[in-house]
Amino acid sequence: MATLHAPAFELPEILNTKTNLADARIGAQVIECSDDFFAEAKRMLQFEAPIFVEDKFDDHGKWMDGWESRRKRHAGYDWCIVKLGVSGKISALDIDTTFFTGNYPASASLEACYAPNGDLTGVTWQSILENTELGPSQHHIFMVNNDAIFTHIRLNIFPDGGIARLRVYGDVHIQVTDHEQTLDLLALENGGRVIAYSDAHFGHPRNLINPGRGVNMGDGWETKRRRAPGYDWCILALGKSGKIEKIEIDTAHFKGNFPAEVSIQAVYLENATDAQLIPQSMFWSYLLEAQPMQMDHIHEYMNEILQHEKVSHIRINMIPDGGISRVRLWGKIAKS
């Protein structure tokens, strides 16, 4: 039973610093859907790229890795309501029909609403994607120009069919209710994002802020072997500025390729552009001076943290190269 994997897809550069708000790993979930007879709607929220398993069938027919409704035999269309993992401003959509060739929808539209208490009764749905034609087995990227904050989306497919994956890219909006609560201020679900990096040959630094521990060596940031003086680095923005109380650096699964040392520089800047941060980052003061690393280990630091009242951005230096799986910055959100 052969398994086909989705072709490699390069996300547009402008979206590399955005968060997929509809990622099941950060809590996105299907609330309601009109029909998912052939394939459960929740599959389209999975982080992993879709697969196609030849000759795999279940009681309802061909098994598909995505959401698929039955063939319509009356007027109308199918729809699915998704609660986003975190509320946020939506910048772009990726409606992916990979492996749906004779069963993709003719077109799709998408609406969004703001319902922080989860009650959708009487909410106003805003259209953020007008009804637009789709094609077979491909990514469809749509840019969104809307400054509103949303908590839920409704995907409409016309008249029926299947969607492999739905990605909703945007900026996380954290509603601060308790400034004394300790959070991982760098976490994906709390709005952390990657701004720039020196190298990502074997693994992207966005993996550093993923939920949970890394599942394998590919689920981390890993650079190529350095053949010149220097070291590798990446710059990240915290979801909210705050005072850091504890740092965790996890080298899970990195055994023959962990860095010799890791250091972290930090700064507090308001309204800084991403472009200005890159050349300035080399001059930021240290939050954590270079620390020796061990293989496949969670390194925890508290007393070693250098004084910073507020931190908004960090630069992680991996000396000289190698791979790390996760970085956590535990602290409290700064009062404005």
From Swiss-Prot:
Keyword Hydrolase: yes
The reaction(s) this protein catalyses: allantoate + H2O = (S)-ureidoglycolate + urea
Keywords recorded for this protein, A-Z: Hydrolase, Purine metabolism
InterPro entries, per database record: Allantoicase, Allantoicase_dom, Galactose-bd-like_sf
Gene3D superfamilies, sorted: Galactose-binding domain-like
Pfam families registered for this protein in UniProt: Allantoicase
Enzyme Commission designation: 3.5.3.4
MF-aspect GO terms: allantoicase activity
EC category name: hydrolase
Domain of life: Bacteria
Biological process per Gene Ontology, one example term: purine nucleobase metabolic process
UniProt pathway annotation: Nitrogen metabolism; (S)-allantoin degradation; (S)-ureidoglycolate from allantoate (aminidohydrolase route): step 1/1
Stated family: Belongs to the allantoicase family.
Protein name: Probable allantoicase
